[in-house]
Amino acid sequence: MARLLFITSNRIGDAVLSTGALEAARALVPGAGVTIACGPLAAPLFRAEPSLERIVVMEKDKLAGHWVALWRDLIGHSYDLAIDLRGSATSYFLPVKKRIVFRSGKAGGHKLDELAALMGSDAPLEMKIHLDPRARRDAKAFAGADKKLLLIGAGANWIGKTWPRENFAALAKRLTKPGAPLTDARIVVLGGPDEGGVLDPLAEDLQK
C-alpha cells in the first residue's frame, strides 16, 4: 500500500487551513495510508482521517529536539509522498519517493494562497475536517437547541496574526442582523486559557 506523510502545524488554526493541502495530497496518492505529524493541540482534528495509520504528536523541545525525535519516529518507514508544511529538512533524511516542502512566500501573502500554490492549484484549496461519532455527539451537545451558531476564534499565537476585535464585532453583528445569513444565530467566542485578554473584551463588545 502507498503511504503519505503529512507534516503540519502545532496550532489549531493553521492546522485547519492545512486540511485542504491534505485533501490535495490524497489525490496524488489515492488510497494511501496516512501518517500525520503535528502538535498536541492540533492532533484531535485529524483523528477521523480516512486511511489514517497514525498521528505522531510533536512536543516542542529545546534546540529543535522535536525534529530529531520526529525523524527517529519515522525512520523505520518509507513514503510515496511527503508533504512538509513546516519547511523542515526531515523528509530529506527519510526514504521518500517524492516530497513537497513549504517555503514561505512574500510577506503579507495569505496562507491559503501559499498552500494552493504549493499544491499546484490556481484556486484556494477547500478545507475539510472529517468527523467521528464522538465529535458529532460533542457538537450536538454544544449546540443544544440552537439551529445556527456563529463561532469566532479571535486569538492568535502572536500579535501580528490578530485582527482588531472591533472588526470581529462589526462582522459578527453584520452577519446576525435581521435579513442576514445568520440572523438570530448564537455567537460563541472561542479561544485558549491564555487568550482572555483578547476574548473577554470582544465578548463585551458583542453584548452592547
What kind of feature is each model-predicted range?
Residues 1-208:
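Catalytic machinery of carbohydrate-active enzymes
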